[in-house]
Amino acid sequence: RHGTPRALADLASHNFVTAGAVAPGHEMRFNHEGKSRVLKMQPRLATTTNESAVAAAVSGFGLTQQMLYKVAEPLARGELQEVLSDFEPPALPVHVLHREGRYASRRVRAFLDLAIERLRALPELRA
């Protein structure tokens, strides 16, 4: 309806769906050619969960900014389209932490090894 945005200025004519966990204060963060930009917007819909923001975007309520693993399935099914990929913010690292001091028990170590293996296997988490 509003066309596909190709530059940040194109976002002015679009509706937005925000999620509290991703866009505190209704902001979207972008990075282009090493420069960070923060755009404040008035969302058409503000949700409290990423899942509801994705569902709203799939239903046509507007654009949403989400981590790739949250939208991998709707993208693969053609329900969503990635836009402004040249303005994507830098990737965030994934950390697996444990509380047990320097050395983990065998059970914790086994869980950590499994979690790390599975996380590394997800293409959505690779930059």
What do the predicted segments below correspond to?
Residues 94-104:
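A bilobed periplasmic-binding-protein/Venus flytrap-type ligand-binding module shared by bacterial periplasmic
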